[in-house]
Amino acid sequence: MAAPAESTRTTGLAWLIWALGAAHYFYAFFQRVTPSVIDQELMRDFAATGSELGSLGGAYFFTYAGLQFPLGILLDRYGPRRIMAISALIAGIGSIGFGLAESLTPAIVGRLLVGAGVGVGLIGTMKLIMVWLPPSRFATITGITMFIGVVGALLGQTPVRLVVDVLGWRETVIWAGAFGLLLAAGIWLIVRDSEKSAVAKHETLTGVWAGLRSILANPQTWCLGLYSAMLSAPILTFTTLWGSTFARESYGLSPDMAVFSMSVALAGFGLGLPSGGWASDQLGQRKQPLWAGAILCLISWLIILCWPQPPLVAALVLFFINGLASGWVVTVFALAREVNLPRFGGSVVGFINMMGIGGVAILQPFTGFLLDQFWDGTIENGIRVYSDLALRQAFLVFPACSAVAVASCFFMRESHNEQVVG
């Protein structure tokens, strides 16, 4: 089925196709955070150590990040319908396998499959946006898509905990797997590939590889990928791993309020995604939101780390602003598409997303390494306790990342929301 013309492209079918893609990304974020909610059950049922639990959690990111670029190539060559449907099927099977696992090894295999299956959620949806919805609204709709993903993360926390308390963790993740199977069926039956979505299929493999080499040889691709990693990795490392600890030990918040403070930061991140895309589309410029996001992140990180113990409201406002500014990273996807050959859009956004997720995968263990270096030796109930000073020293890596993001802005090319290559 061919894509409709520009003037009529925004039809009900086009929006339904996008909605299914956005649901895929929602599912990706939901699956990403669920293990953090059931960590005690996992350690109990698998007799897992902290290191082993870390391996189980990291399995998702390993396949998710590693497959971004290959998935982008497959999207360009074969179109989103088949790739996204098969991927959702794999994720659903992986989640069901995870729920049925009786030992750690098959559980890790299940999570590897989940990561592999949901990895196409964002880049596949952006590919659908490129070919079914108006190009002038690409950044805005991409931001809304990523906001929907953050909603998945929020629903994957406290609501999932409530369900686990009623059904148990195995039943919960098995039902999550069943949703993946239904999503696969919906994508297969409803999503249609346009002529543009698989244009690379008509090229020779030599032509495809030449195009991919042009992406990797483009300094702008690397500059934007670096920005993506440096702006998104700190907020995701903070909110999904160490932020609650910091809020308790450094700001003196109660455990419940510390968790809530990270939800506030995630809410800011979620709102920053569509607002950053909208601002970019309205301004007719890509670099301004990127500049603003990086500078505001740098300032807010420094205040967060240097203010000894701010009032609760001030702490929540700081976390929200930091998340909001971090969400403006969304504009890099639009700019990356505009400074590379348009027919390889899936490959471009896959590479940018790979660098962003790869930044998280590197920064999380590196932050843990820094904490161990600054640890004063305190142990409670067999668990290392990191002091306020150790946390603040280790987390200086976050504003350092923001500073790199600011520096990268000097080397970006402004597209003025126009396709400048190809």
What does each of the following model-derived ranges do?
Residues 3-10, 193-225:
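Juxtamembrane intracellular "pre-TM" segments in multi-pass secondary transporters
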Residues 35-37, 218-276, 333, 360-371:
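Extracytoplasmic gate region of multi-pass secondary transporters
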Residues 47, 79, 100-106, 134, ...:
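Helix-breaking motifs and short loop linkers at transmembrane-helix boundaries and internal kinks
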Residues 66-105:
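Conserved MFS/SLC helix-loop-helix module at the cytosolic interface between two early adjacent transmembrane helices
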Residues 77-87, 281-295:
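Cytoplasmic membrane-interface "Motif A"-like loop-to-helix N-cap segments
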Residues 89-102, 295-309:
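C-terminal ends and interior cores of transmembrane alpha-helices
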Residues 110-149:
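Cytoplasmic helix-loop-helix junction between adjacent transmembrane helices
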Residues 145-193:
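Helix-loop-helix hairpin linking two adjacent transmembrane segments in secondary transporters
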